[in-house]
């Protein structure tokens, strides 16, 4: 019969940390063979203990989301490559700068999709002694690089559009342009459908979108705008050949919309890199949940942040009465917070008699 060996940290009244193995408790209760290591027992006994890190449910959710993200990115890459080649050929034949620049946008998208796939693989690597949290943030860095690619290619489009406004000496085959741009719109709509994810946040008991797929979705959404601009300009030029200026004008307008679409994703990722509270979680609500646990007198040094989207970490200092069993309090807090599927939970138990009301580090953060 196999037994799990676990080690827990409990803070004594002098706030010194001691580590001790809980061999006695583990000998009393064998491990369920059908239960994943680190998962919480279905029916913990009174005073029972379960592992402090993420549950098997959270681990399974992470693996499932990674698999879905990889499938979506692979499918998007294949579609993107096919229609990129089609637009290069069609744009060259039609003599349309808008189609060629849209093909260039697809090339950047393809590069970003492959970069996102690489970052997903990198984020699945195990932690090292130097990178103790692992490579999860590689997913965010890859997504930010993807946004940077959007800015670069959109800047090029704006420059070329301005150049055509100043020097309108060019010819366009509007018929071919309509056919190619129409197919591009359809292809990009398919891309957005593949990459679209639901994003309700924790209050709706749903998960937030994968960072890499979310950035890829913004790319595809930008491609839809760009392709629509090409199609609109093609229709205008087809019916009114003298209005070929519509080609650079539409490119200019929808390039601005593409830039605007990246602002929100950049804001969310910046907050994540600044160790902000994850979107959908409320600091005050989490604190109230902890205070509601039997034996908890006060809560301070509560920190909530994310390694990456859906990888939430929480650490907290909890003051209890000297007569209170620290292990039962820790277990109660972990059970109360289990609905959040935390990646890692650290609880430091302290004596209420040792609290210092004048300590600035123990004060609640500002609103």
From Swiss-Prot:
Lumenal, vesicle side: 100-102, 161-174, 238-244
Knocked-out gene: effects: Knockout mice lacking Slc30a8 do not display overt developmental, morphological or behavioral phenotypes. However, a significant difference in plasma insulin concentration is observed.
Residue spans, topological domain Cytoplasmic: 1-78, 124-139, 196-216, 266-367
Binding locations of Zn(2+) 4: 343
Domain of life: Eukaryota
Record's catalysed reaction(s): Zn(2+)(in) + 2 H(+)(out) = Zn(2+)(out) + 2 H(+)(in)
Any GO BP annotation: insulin processing
GO cellular-component term (any): cytoplasmic vesicle
Positions of Zn(2+) 1 binding: 105, 109, 219, 223
Expression sites by tissue: Expressed in endocrine pancreatic islet alpha and beta cells. Not detected in the brain.
Entry's Gene Ontology molecular function annotations: metal ion binding; protein homodimerization activity; zinc ion transmembrane transporter activity; zinc:proton antiporter activity
Binding-site residues for Zn(2+) 2, renumbered to this chain: 52, 300, 317, 350
Membrane topology according to the record: Multi-pass membrane protein
Residue ranges crossing the lipid bilayer per the database entry: 79-99, 103-123, 140-160, 175-195, 217-237, 245-265
Entry keyword set: Antiport, Cell membrane, Cytoplasmic vesicle, Ion transport, Membrane, Metal-binding, Transmembrane, Transmembrane helix, Transport, Zinc, Zinc transport
InterPro entries, A to Z: Cation_efflux, Cation_efflux_CTD_sf, Cation_efflux_TMD_sf, CDF/SLC30A
Binding site for Zn(2+) 3: 51, 53, 359, 362
Location of the protein in the cell: Cytoplasmic vesicle, Secretory vesicle membrane; Cell membrane
Motif (HCH Motif): 51-53
Principal subcellular localization: membrane
Misc. comment: Each subunit of the homodimer independently transports zinc ions in a pH-dependent manner. The cytosolic pH promotes binding of zinc ions to the transporter binding site. Upon change into the organelle-facing conformation, the two histidines of the zinc-binding site get protonated at lumenal lower pH, triggering zinc release into the organelle. The transporter then moves back to the cytosolic-facing conformation where the two histidines get deprotonated at higher pH, resulting in a net antiport of 2 protons.
Quaternary structure and interacting proteins, as annotated: Homodimer.
Physiological role: Proton-coupled zinc ion antiporter mediating the entry of zinc into the lumen of pancreatic beta cell secretory granules, thereby regulating insulin secretion.
Family that this chain belongs to: Belongs to the cation diffusion facilitator (CDF) transporter (TC 2.A.4) family. SLC30A subfamily.
Name this protein carries in UniProt: Proton-coupled zinc antiporter SLC30A8
Species lineage: Eukaryota, Metazoa, Chordata, Craniata, Vertebrata
Gene: Slc30a8
């Amino acid at each position: 019969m196999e037994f799990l060996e676990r080690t827990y940290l409990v803070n004594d009244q002098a706030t010194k940390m001691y580590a001790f193995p809980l061999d006695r408790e583990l000998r009393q209760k064998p491990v369920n063979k059908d239960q994943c290591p680190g998962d919480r027992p279905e029916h913990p006994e009174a005073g029972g203990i379960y592992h402090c890190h993420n549950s098997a449910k959270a681990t399974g959710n992470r693996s499932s989301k990674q698999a879905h993200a990889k499938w979506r990115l692979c499918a998007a890459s294949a579609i993107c490559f096919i229609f990129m080649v089609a637009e290069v050929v069609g744009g060259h034949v039609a003599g349309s700068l808008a189609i060629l620049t849209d093909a260039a946008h697809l090339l950047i998208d393809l590069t970003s999709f492959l970069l996102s796939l690489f970052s997903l693989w990198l984020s699945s690597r195990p932690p090292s002694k130097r990178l103790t949290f692992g490579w999860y943030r590689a997913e965010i860095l890859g997504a930010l690089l993807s946004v940077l690619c959007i800015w670069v290619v959109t800047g090029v489009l704006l420059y070329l559009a301005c150049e055509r406004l100043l020097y309108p000496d060019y010819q366009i085959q509007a018929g071919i342009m309509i056919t190619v741009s129409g197919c591009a719109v359809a292809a990009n709509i398919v891309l957005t459908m593949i990459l679209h994810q639901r994003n309700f946040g924790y209050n709706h008991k749903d998960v937030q979108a994968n960072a890499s797929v979310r950035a890829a979705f913004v790319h595809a959404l930008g491609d839809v705008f760009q392709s629509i601009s090409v199609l609109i300009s093609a229709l205008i030029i087809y019916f009114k050949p003298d209005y070929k200026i519509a080609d650079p004008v539409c490119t200019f307008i929808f390039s601005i919309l593409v830039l605007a679409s990246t602002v929100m994703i950049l804001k969310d990722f910046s907050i994540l890199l600044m160790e902000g509270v994850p979107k959908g979680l409320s600091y005050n609500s989490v604190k109230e949940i902890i205070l509601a646990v039997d034996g908890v007198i006060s809560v301070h040094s509560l920190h909530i942040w994310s390694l990456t989207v859906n990888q939430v970490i929480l650490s907290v200092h909890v003051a209890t009465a000297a007569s209170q069993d620290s292990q039962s309090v820790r277990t109660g807090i972990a059970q109360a917070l289990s609905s959040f599927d935390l990646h890692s939970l650290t609880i430091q138990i302290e004596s209420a008699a040792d609290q210092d009301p004048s300590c600035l580090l123990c004060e609640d953060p500002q609103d």
